Amino acid sequence: MSTDLVRFIADLSNRWRSRFSPSRPEHLRLGARGEKLACRFLRRSGYKVLYRNFRGRSGGEIDIVCRDKDTLVFVEVKTRTREDFGRPFDAIDRSKQKRIARGGLAWLRLLDDPDILFRFDVVEVIIVEDAQPRFELLRNAFALPEPYIY
């Protein structure tokens, strides 16, 4: 068995164990729940979900990769239990945008199609006790922070 395959299987196993571990911190469990709810919301909104939790080799990360008609969409999900400290979108600063952009560019490199249309969306998920989750979809929430080459 190749070393890359062994590494891939070990990484997958670690992710699986850590995702469902009962000792996982509350904020991580909340984030995972928000991503699951956001996937359902996006499907109901007509998006086709392609992948969850993509990590690029360059350190970039994408919560959800999906398609909206002919456009590839990289979605960042922000989940909160209240809005006392501003909207969830406010937590996406320039450095977070760069990390998301690196993940998106890593995905585009895998496709090897420089002419594909893409954008970055944000889904805000507000989960309040004893109420239905609330969703806000911000299409084209931000642009690439700098010119890109892939």
Roles of regions detected by a PLM:
Residues 52-56, 123-126:
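Short, solvent-exposed loop/turn elements at beta->coil junctions and helix N-caps
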Residues 2-52:
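Acidic-basic catalytic patches of nuclease active cores, encompassing PD-(D/E)XK
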Residues 25, 29, 33, 59, ...:
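Residues at secondary-structure transition points
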Residues 79-130:
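Catalytic cores of nucleic-acid endonucleases
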Residues 2-4, 110-150:
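Domain-level recognition of nuclease-like catalytic cores that cleave nucleotide substrates
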